[in-house]
Swiss-Prot record:
NAD(+) binds at residues 284-298. GO terms for molecular function: flavin adenine dinucleotide binding. NAD-binding protein involved in the addition of a carboxymethylaminomethyl (cmnm) group at the wobble position (U34) of certain tRNAs, forming tRNA-cmnm(5)s(2)U34. Belongs to the MnmG family. This is tRNA uridine 5-carboxymethylaminomethyl modification enzyme MnmG. Its main location: cytoplasm. InterPro entries: FAD/NAD-bd_sf, GIDA_C_N, MnmG, MnmG-rel, MnmG-rel_CS, MnmG_C, MnmG_C_subdom, MnmG_C_subdom_sf. Homodimer. Heterotetramer of two MnmE and two MnmG subunits. Keywords: Cytoplasm, FAD, Flavoprotein, NAD, tRNA processing. It is found in: Cytoplasm. FAD binds at G17, G18, G19, H20, A21, G22.
Amino acid sequence: MQSPYIYPQEFDVIVVGGGHAGTEAALASARMGCKTLLLSHNIETLGQMSCNPSIGGIGKGHLVKEVDAMGGAMALATDEGGIQFRILNSSKGPAVRATRAQADRILYKAAIRRRLENQPNLWLFQQAVDDLMVEGDRVVGAVTQVGIRFRSRTVVLTAGTFLDGKIHVGLNNYAAGRAGDPPAVSLSSRLKELKLPQGRLKTGTPPRIDGRTIDFSKCIEQPGDGMPGGTAGPVPVFSFMGGAIPHPQQMPCWITHTNERTHEIIRSGFDRSPMFTGKIDGVGPRYCPSVEDKINRFADKESHQIFLEPEGLTTHEIYPNGISTSLPFDIQYELVRSMAGMENAHILRPGYAIEYDYFDPRALKTTFETRAIGGLFFAGQINGTTGYEEAAAQGMFAGINAALQCRALGGLPNDHGGAWLPRRDEAYLGVLVDDLITKGVTEPYRMFTSRAEYRLMLREDNADMRLTEKGRELGLVDDARWDAFSRKRDAVSRETERLRSLWVNPHNLPLAEAERVLGKSIEREYNLLDLLRRPDVNYAGLMSLEEGKYANPELAAEAAASDDLAKSVIEQIEITAKYAGYIDLQKTEVERAAHYENLKLPTDLDYLQVSALSFEARQTLARHRPETLGMASRISGITPATVSLLLVHLKKNLWKNTVPLKTTDTSTEKAQA
C-alpha cells in the first residue's frame, strides 16, 4: 500500500469548497494575513451560481452589503456581472429597502475567480476532500481523494449540497452534489463518524429554457431600475466601492403565469413525485417551495407568477423563477408549455430536487467552530441555510474566526480575544449567527428583515457605517476602501454639524417658500437638521431656501455631477435625521437588554440540578448549553419566566458561591441524547 503524501507546506486555514461560503471564507482569512488553502473539486466552478442567477433581495441584500462593508467580494462581483438591478420596497421605509440584481453567471464567476487568484496569502488546489485529519479532539488538516494530506491549524468546511447529495427527477434518483458534479460521500461518512448531530434537507431548481423558443410578446416585460420603462434614475450599485465599476449591458426580465391547465398537469404527476411518494426525506425551503408544493398547499389559487430571468449576455438560456420542480420530465415538459409565451418552449436542462446532509448548527460555538472538534468550522448550507447571500455571510464570518484562532495559536497580537461576534443590533450577520446557534433549523433557513428586531438600525445604506471600521481593525479592509469610507464618514459628520449650526428665521422666510419646502410656515427659529426631521422635507428643498443661502456649494456640485459619494452622504444624513427618534428608542432597548444579553452562563453549570426550572426547560438548556443569558432566552421552548428563574438562581448561587456544577455522572449526557 502506497504511503500517504504529506504536502510540504503547512497552512493556517484550509477552506473546503469553492462556492459562495468557501470563497468569502478563503478571501477573509487571507486578507487577515493567514496562509490559506482553498480546496475545490473543480477550480472551474469557483463562485458558481448553482441555482438562480440573482443576488440580493429582502434581507439577503442587507447581508451582501454587510459582507461588502468588510471587504468581501460578492457585491463587487455582482456589480461587474449584474445585468439588471432593482431596489425592492423603494416606496417603503429605508429599513426594508433592498437591492436585488440579476447576474450574468459567466461574468460573476470570472469576477470571483480573478479575486481569488490575485489575493495574497491564498493558494488554490483542485482536489475533492475525502477525509479530515484529526488528532485527539482537534482537526489538523484535510485529506484529498488521491491521499494528499494538507496540514493546517484550522479547517473551514463549506460543502454546500455535496454531502451525500442525491438528485431526484420523478421516481429516478442518482448520487450528485449538483447536476454534473459528484457528491462528497466519503467526507459525509467521515463527519458522521465524528458523532456530529446531522439531518437531511432538500432544495430544488427549475428546468432551464431556450429563450429563442419563448414568445416574449405574450409575456409582461420587467425592466430594471434605470432602464427604459423602469424606475427613473441611475442603475443601482451593490458595493460601497461599486460606483467606479461600469455595469455590463442591462437586460429586462419577463413575467408569465401558471393557469388552471398548468395546475392540472402538475397534479397529474403527484403519484410520481418524489415529494409525495416518500422518496425524499429532507425538508425543503418554505420560502422557495417547488411548484408542486405550491399547487398542493394553495389549491384555491388560480395562478402563480413566473419570472423569466436571463442567465447572461452570451447565452439564450432562461431561468424560470417559480417552477422549481422534481416532477418527472414528461410532466415538466407539459407544464412549461402550458404557460403563455411558452407554448413552443424547449427545455435545455430538466429541473430537479437535491437532498443533502446538514449538521445541526446548535452544535456549533458562537464562532461557528464545532464543539466536538477544535479548529473545525462550518459555514453555508452545511449549517442548514439556503441562499448564496446567507452562505457568503457565514463564510466570511467563519473565515474571520478561523483566522483569529490561528493568530491566538501562533501567539500573534489579537485584540478580539480569538473571536469576532457581531451582536443582533450590529448586523444582520449577527441575527443569522444567533438564530442558527440558538434555535437551530427544521427547514432551510433564509434571511428576512422581519427576523431582525433592530432592523431600523440595520439598514442597507449604513452597513459601511456599522461595519467597515471593525473590518479595518480585523485586517479585512484595504487602503482604497478605508479611504473611501473615511471620506464618506467625515463628510456626513461635517455636513450634519453644518446643518445643526444653520438657523432659519421665520421673519426672513417668505410664506410661499415655507409652504413649498416645509409644507407650512414656521413660527420660531429652527436649525436645518431639525427641519430635515419632518417627514415631507428633503435635503434638496432645504438647500433651495432663501435663494440657496444654506447650500453647501462643494456637495451640491458633486451631487450635480452624479458623484456617488455626495449622494450617499446626503442619503445618510436624511435617513438618520428622519428616523433619529425611532433609532434612539431602539438604542435604549439595546442598552436595557445588553446587561442580561451578555451575562455569561457558567460553562460547567449543571442545568439538571436547577430545581426551580421545569424538567423540560432543564433538559432543553442542558442540550443546548447556551453561552449567555441572551442566547438562552432565544432558544425555542424557553419562556421569559424560565429566563427570570434562571437569573434568580444565578444571583442566589453567585452570592453563596455555590453554583451547582456538572457532576461526573452521565445525567447531562443522557439529557442531551
